[in-house]
Amino acid sequence: MTDFKEIILTHKLSALFSKASFGIEKESQRITDEGTIAKTNHPTIFGNRSFHPYIQTDFAESQPELITPPMQSIEEMHEWLMAIHDVVLRSLPEGEYLLPCSIPPAMPASEEIKVAKLDNESDVAYREYLVSVYGNKKQMVSGIHFNFELNPVLIKELHQLSGSVRTLREFQSDVYLKMAHNFIRYQWIMTYLLGGSISADRSYFEKESQHDLPLDQYTRSIRSSKYGYVNKADVHVSFESIDAYVQDIEKMVTTGKLIAEKEFYSTVRFRGANKARDLLTNGIAYLEFRLFDLNPFAEFGMHKEDMYFIHYFLLYLLWIDQDASEAEMQLGKEMNYSTALENPLQPSAFQAEGLSVLEGMLQMLEAIDAEEKISAIVKEKIEAFQNPEKTVAGQMVKALEAGEDKTAWAASLAKKYKEAAWKRPYALRGFEDMELSTQILMFDAIQKGLKINMLDRYDQFISLTYKDHREYVKNGNMTAKDSYIGPLIMENKVVTKKILAENGFAVPDSGEYHSAAAALRDYSIFAGKGIVVKPKTTNYGLGISIFKDGATFENYEKAVRIAFEADEDILVEDFLFG
C-alpha cells in the first residue's frame, strides 16, 4: 500500500497536496410567500435548459439546480455560487423564493408535483419512472453535490515517487478509490456535523411499507437516513475495485433491479465516464460527493467554512494509512444511517471516533503547514462534537423551539436571502471587485446560459461562448468589433497563454500571484524545476528572473520581490528551452 503521507512530507509536496479543483451542484425548491411549493413553470428568462451551464432543473419543474463551473479554489467556487444565486433570485417572479431547507416543510399533494418539463422525452420518462418506484415526495428533497479533483500534477508526482508499476491512469483510479472507500467509512461525521433535514410530514413516507420514525421527534438528517433517497434493498454494488463496480452496476441493470445505471444511488460517485464500463478505459477523473443537506442558515446553501472543512476532510482520507475494506464500508453505511436518525441535541454514539478523526486532521494540517484558518475550522467541528447544539441540525432544533411554524420559519429565511440579493441590484456578488460594466455583462451571460471564461479577472478580461461562437471581452464593452482588442490580448501574458492553450498550442504551466506571501507559500511546487519568475504585463525584460536548473528558496524569494517591483501581479512558470 502506498504511503502517501510519507511521500508528501519527504518530497515537500504539501502545497501541491492542498491544491484541487472544486464544483458544486445545489438543488432548491421555488416557493411562494406562504412557503408552499411554487406551481409556476421554470422561468423562461433562464433560456433553454438543454444547454444552460449554470441553471438547470433537477426532478421537479419547481426545483432549480445551480451549478458552478469547476474552479481551482474554494474561494472561487464560493464566488460563483454567490453570483449564480444573485442571478436566480433577482430573476424569479415577485413572490417567489428559494427554499433554504432540504425537505419542504409543506409538502404538496402528489398530484400537484410536476416533473421537469424538459425537451428530451427520455429524461421526462425517466423521472416518471422514478415516481412509480420511489414516489414523487422523495424526489422533492434537495441537497448539494460536492465535486472534487486532486491536482493532476500531484497525481503524477505521487505515481512517479511511489515507484508504482501501475499505469498513471490506473494509479489515479486507485487514489480515488481509496478516498471513496474511506469517505463511505467516515461519512457519518459529515451527517453528524452538517445534516439538516430534521423532519418531514407524514405524506413523505407514503411509499414506505412501514417505518419506525416518530414524526413528532427531530432527527439529524432524514435525507441521509434509510428513509432518504436510497435504492431498494436488493440493489448491491461493490466499491472494492472499478472492475467489481462495473460488473455489479451492469448486473443490476440486466436483471431489472435498476432501469438504468444512473438510477444507482450512492453518497459518492465515480466521475469521468458516461457509462460505468467506460471507467475501465478512462479511469476515475474526479469524485462527486452527494451526501450534503442544505444548511438553512447559509445564504447559499453551505457556509464557505464548511466547504474548506470538506476539502481537508477529503485530503485526510488520502493521508491516512487506512483503505477501508468492503466490511468497513458496510459498517460506515450503518453508522451513517444510525447517526442520521439520532436526536440532534444528543451526543453522537460514535463521538470518540469522530473526535479521533478530527484530531488526526489537526495533526495533518500541522504537518503540511496549512493556513491557521483551516485549523480553526476543524477546532470548531471538535466543539460541535462536544456540544451537539452547534451542529446544523442542533441549530435548527434550537431555532424552532421558539415555537415558530417550520414553514413560516423557512419562508422568512428565504425572503431574507432574496432581499440580500437585491440590496445592490446592479452588482454581482462574488465579482464585486470587477468593473460594474463587467458585472452587468456577467449577470446577463449567467442568466441566458452563455459560458463565461475568466481570462484575467484583474484586467477585466473574459470570454463568452455559445455553441461554436466565442467573443473576447475587455472592460465589459470591448470585443472583436473594436480593433484594439488584439493588442490588448497580446499585451497580457496570462490572456495570451490561455487563448493559445485553447487553440492547441503548447504553453508553459504557470502560477499567477497577487501577493508575495502567496508566491512564497507555493515554493515547494517549483523547487528543483527550471522556472521563470516575471511580471505579468511589463515587457522589455524588466523584473524577469530565469532559473534553468531550479532556484534555492533564497533566490526564489529575491526573484519574487524583483518581479513585484515591476508589476502588481507576477507569474511563475516552467522554463522551456527554445
Could you say what each language-model-derived stretch is?
Residues 290-368:
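Substrate-recognition/cap regions that form aromatic- and gly/pro-loop-enriched pockets
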Residues 1-131, 138-142, 178:
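Terminal catalytic/cofactor-binding subdomain
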Residues 9-10, 106, 117-136, 140, ...:
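Loop-rich catalytic cores of soluble enzymes, especially ATP-dependent carboxylate-amine ligases
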Residues 475-478, 482-578:
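Active-site nucleotide/adenylate-binding loops and adjacent lid/helix of ATP-dependent enzymes
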